[in-house]
Amino acid sequence: RKIDVLINNAGAGITGPLEEIPMEKLKTNFETNLFGPIGIINAVLPSMRQQKSGLVINITSIAAYMGLPFRGVYSASKGALELVTEAYRMELKPFDIQMTNVAPAAFSTNIAAGRYHAPENDNSPYKSTYGKTLKLLNGHVDAGQDPIILAKLVHSIIQTKKPKIHYKVGAFLQRFSIILKRLLPDRIFEKLLMSFYRL
């Protein structure tokens, strides 16, 4: 059986104050966003190694590049997948197996429908800030770009002989935020991020 391409596109959203997200929900998110993809990758590697070719595309997120308020678990799980991909790439070089990350920004999908939201508790010290962030997040998804843009990028990567390690796709401002994080002092970038989230 020949497996030429694996696309790890499964992903689960999760929002809430880190202090208030149940540990079981955190673990479930990592199962979907990190451990699941690793398990599938490991399942196909023997076939790819035998045929001396193969491509794995891991769909991560722009959120993987920074810790986002009330999305810390999601940022962490997707960020971990980015780093795992980098490690896999080096380990798999001798077998001519390619691996890459694709980090989308906001796209108009149904991810919000399946996202776990920590309850908005009236007694929570995060009530006002978390509520504002939730509304903002849902607005970003509703106003997101057409997923066909992402699909076309994935198709072009499959046609590429030597894919890059990382691809970012989506609105310019969201992609540019990664560059800003590298260029700006940490405190300045943190202030910009908090301003964006109206915190």
Regions found by a protein language model. Name each.
Residues 19, 66-72:
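Active-site loop immediately N-terminal to the catalytic Tyr-X3-Lys motif
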Residues 41-42, 86:
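A short, exposed helix-loop element centered on a Lys and neighboring polar residues
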Residues 9-14:
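Conserved NAD(P)H cofactor-binding loop of Rossmann-fold oxidoreductase domains
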Residues 41, 77-80:
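Active-site helix of classical SDR
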